[in-house]
Amino acid sequence: MSQYQAVKGTKDVFPDEAVQWQLVEGVVRRLAGLYAFGEVRTPVFEYTELFQRGIGATTDIVGKEMFSFLPDPQGRSLTLRPEMTAGVMRAALQRNLLSQAPLHKLFYISDLFRKERPQAGRQRQFTQFGAELLGASSPAAVAEVLSFMMGVFDALGLKGLRLRINTLGDLEDRARYRDALRAYFLPFADELDESSKERLEKNPLRILDSKNPALKELIAAAPRLFDFVKAEGVAEFEEVLSLLRDRGVSYEVDHLLVRGLDYYCHTAFEVTSSELGAQDAIGGGGRYDGLARELGGGKDMPAVGFAVGMERLLIAMEKQGLLEGLKPVGPKVFVVVQQLELSGHAMQVAFQLRRAGISTELDLAGRSMKAQMREANRLGAAYALFIGQTEFESGQYGLKNLVSSEQSTLTLDSITETLREPLLCG
């Protein structure tokens, strides 16, 4: 064993597990194509103030969880991105996207970093996929983003998910609600945990996010944000719900739902799974019209998005048996060489097969034929192609189907034509 180990809260992924990630990533990319979302990639680190302004200085992410490091030569602190939305909005403003087209639909599959206590489904380096729709935040835009997210879950076969949705109102609504919450919790200040006491002073909405079971009843009896939302905000929220019903998306209205990031406004949502225990959130999102202004864009930009944690999603899939039998695809052909001196010719044969689009593996360690066949079976190769002196001289190679054990003798051109994957037309 090496004296060097992976850093706590990080994980190595090898091919037998990577195939699970590839399954999810493939579904995300396919659904993104169906919904006409294009991929966006942003730097893995940004200036720290981007997240302080964008996410909110009173949030746990900014206050406790960011990996910030030595300033750049200009003396500005840098931070490994803890979430994607602020970086995507920064990129959109920098590129001045909305001057090029009124609407942009973007998706990502990206690694993120937070100083969390490592546990099942929560790592310090983790992966999220998500989407950002910039230029519109109408009920139709919200329904579009939600349909994309729930469509991914449906395509993966996940069952028992719970979509909770709420309206957070606008800035004025939330300001009045914060005052009401502070007045409600203040008489119970001695009963609050230290984290909630801090939140009571800075942003009492964050108390509603508490996972402390001792506060459950107190939080449940708190005033509802919904009661502070203006009539037009309520009507807009009802239209979102109507569109979700039209699309067959099941949901629960949860008036205590708030998101852990300060940029959300109006519609917010969260998806949970009973497979994950107390920390049951798989993903969530909502509208964030004011983020562009907060980041120096000069005015609000209509926007709505979501993010889903890949590690947590995979845990839920595993518990539902959706990953059983999933393994890396083996090579189509394993070239078995009988004499070591024919290894050069075996490499030429493998090269020609690969150039024809046929996945091919061969022995690179000078092993016996028996050992080579064991390796072909271990890898799950579909065929073994045998090269001995006779095959080398005649140009006729033995090809064995490793499933049916059927064997034939063919030229390399014939083998190529037999095994080549049919091209897609149209």
Swiss-Prot record:
Compartment annotation: Cytoplasm
Coiled coil regions, renumbered to chain: none
Disulfide bonds: none
Keyword Nucleotide-binding: yes
Biological process annotations from GO: histidyl-tRNA aminoacylation
Enzyme Commission code(s) on record: 6.1.1.21
UniProt keyword Transport, yes or no: no
PROSITE patterns: AA_TRNA_LIGASE_II (PS50862)
Protein family membership: Belongs to the class-II aminoacyl-tRNA synthetase family.
Protein's UniProt name: Histidine--tRNA ligase
Taxonomic placement: Bacteria, Pseudomonadati, Chlorobiota, Chlorobiia, Chlorobiales
